[in-house]
UniProtKB/Swiss-Prot annotation:
Residues 1-52, 191-234 are annotated as: Disordered. Residues 49-104 form the bHLH domain. This is Hairy/enhancer-of-split related with YRPW motif protein 1. It comes from the Eukaryota. Gene3D superfamilies: 6.10.250.980, Helix-loop-helix DNA-binding domain (4.10.280.10). Signal peptide: none annotated. It is found in: Nucleus. It comes from Canis lupus familiaris (Dog). Residues 122-158 form the Orange domain. Belongs to the HEY family.
Length: 304
């Protein structure tokens, strides 16, 4: 009699293996039809039901494997970087996962569980993706070939910047949790030296560091017309955005992740500010006089 709720006990597996052995022996002797014909209709229906059940189990097993590989492709940074350009094989995903785990083990087991290290890893990957998109835009939309001076300067600058940021993040990896602004290589409340307003007077060309408070004060006095574009003074940090979450909607693992992320508040000073020279109306006039299309980002690249 057929059971209403079939189980997947060891007896079923043994019976399935016995049936497979009988089929193989029948194939070898050429007596497959006679072997099946000797069974009763009840036994034949049970064999077909078990085969159908085995196919369902095999399909579920393959689905679990594919879902796990998809999660690994999303979680492992090296696999996540390559998934947009080419299709990864299962062996490649597993190899990247093994390499990533070895790297974490070498780093002391802190790398992937460190919120700052995780954010820096994906920030580096995102910057590389943006760099590739800029190169595609220059070649496809702007029509600039690989030997164009503007394209060479821009791509070279972005490559150098990415390499410097990766080297800086690697140097700070052993210092524990750092504020988000340290990922940019300068203090969050101080603007980038290349984006500070340049003065033509000789008193601002001294040997003072761009991050020196007195140097910042002289620059502020030399350019009083752009108060909104200057960063806050070095005595205090800029406005901070706290991470706001609802504890009642998060599971315990997510709560621990949010707690670790709350140690790194975002600061408006971390984002690079534009120089007032970049907003001056003389840039379009100069570009028009040269007979070239106006590219405001092209005029700024020459300073690097």
């Amino acid at each position: 009699m057929k059971r209403a709720h079939p189980d997947y006990s060891s007896s079923d597996s043994e019976l399935d293996e016995t049936v497979e052995v009988e089929k193989e022996s029948a194939d070898e002797n050429g007596n497959l039809s006679s072997a099946l014909g000797s069974m009763s209709p009840t036994t034949s229906s049970q064999i077909l039901a078990r085969k159908r059940r085995r196919g369902i189990i095999e399909k579920r097993r393959r689905d679990r494997i594919n879902n796990s590989l998809s999660e690994l492709r999303r979680l492992v940074p090296s696999a996540f970087e390559k998934q947009g350009s080419a299709k990864l094989e299962k062996a490649e995903i597993l190899q990247m996962t093994v390499d990533h785990l070895k790297m974490l083990h070498t780093a002391g087991g802190k790398g992937y569980f460190d919120a700052h290290a995780l954010a820096m890893d994906y920030r580096s990957l995102g910057f590389r993706e943006c760099l590739a998109e800029v190169a595609r835009y220059l070649s496809i939309i702007e029509g600039l070939d690989a030997s164009d001076p503007l394209r060479v300067r821009l791509v070279s600058h972005l490559n150098n910047y990415a390499s410097q940021r990766e080297a800086a993040s690697g140097a700070h990896a052993g210092l524990g949790h750092l504020p988000w602004g340290s990922a940019f290589g300068h203090h969050p409340h101080v603007a980038h030296p290349l984006l500070l307003p340049q003065s033509g007077h000789g008193n601002t060309g001294t040997s003072a560091s761009p991050t020196d408070p007195h140097h910042q004060g002289r620059l502020a006095a030399a350019h009083p017309e752009a108060p909104a574009l200057r960063a806050p003074p070095s005595g205090g940090l800029g406005p901070v955005l706290p991470v706001v979450t609802s504890a009642s909607k998060l599971s315990p693992p997510l709560l621990s992740s949010v707690a670790s992320l709350s140690a790194f508040p975002f600061s408006f000073g971390s984002f690079h500010l534009l120089s007032p020279n970049a907003l001056s109306p003389s840039a379009p006039t100069q570009a028009a006089n040269l007979g070239k299309p106006y590219r405001p980002w092209g005029t700024e690249i020459g300073a690097f």
